[in-house]
Amino acid sequence: MQTFIHGGGRLPEAVDAALAHYRHQIFVGQLGWQLPMADGRFERDQYDRDDTVYVVARDADGAICGCARLLPTTRPYLLKDVFAPLLMRGVPAPESPGVWELSRFAARSGASRARGARPDWAVRPMLASVVQCAAQRGARRLIGVTFVSMVRLFRRIGVRAHHAGPVRCIGGRPVVACWIDIDASTCAALGIPGASVVPGPALQ
């Protein structure tokens, strides 16, 4: 798995199409999400903007095998606009340059689906790239909505992940707003050197 970062303007057309198709495969095809802006092949929404930061993973054949979307909470973002009821009662959605939203996170590989393979085989390196990318942009915490099972996986890896609100059932599965602390413990668990803020390669 090799990860690429894009955070400067619109995605290149070929990358945009490949990423939207991968997201449709994962979030619509596999997870069965009912997303109003998804068509028969591609998944995009109003948060895919010029200021959106993308982390994209490719396998040895160049095919996309992971993705993540990072949004500054100082601009409109998914949790604040759509999922604010998932936060603790009376707690406003964060608006801070030190907090970024993580959404559309996915990671898979042929090896990770092999019998006996650990489920974090693909998640850990993908999340490491996401955390490092966000930290480079001033983030000290990430927030997002995810499955409760994913929070447990993050914790097993050693990431400082904790609930930002109550568990709710959406689409038949328990989901929760989740904080990820970008601290020494999380960086150590993900194999990120403490002072490592070296930008990754740009998407081509």
From Swiss-Prot:
UniProt EC number: 2.3.1.184
Enzyme class, broadest EC rank: transferase
Pfam families per the UniProt record, alphabetical: Autoind_synth (PF00765)
Entry keyword set: Autoinducer synthesis, Quorum sensing, S-adenosyl-L-methionine, Transferase
GO BP field: quorum sensing; signal transduction
Signal peptide (from-to): none
Domain of life: Bacteria
Catalyzed reactions per annotation: a fatty acyl-[ACP] + S-adenosyl-L-methionine = an N-acyl-L-homoserine lactone + S-methyl-5'-thioadenosine + holo-[ACP] + H(+)
Gene3D superfamilies in the record: 3.40.630.30
Recorded GO MF terms: N-acyl homoserine lactone synthase activity
Function: Required for the synthesis of acyl-HSL autoinducers that bind to SolR.
Family the UniProt entry places it in: Belongs to the autoinducer synthase family.
PANTHER family: ACYL-HOMOSERINE-LACTONE SYNTHASE (PTHR39322), ISOVALERYL-HOMOSERINE LACTONE SYNTHASE (PTHR39322:SF1)
Protein name per its UniProtKB record: Acyl-homoserine-lactone synthase
Record organism: Ralstonia nicotianae (strain ATCC BAA-1114 / GMI1000) (Ralstonia solanacearum)
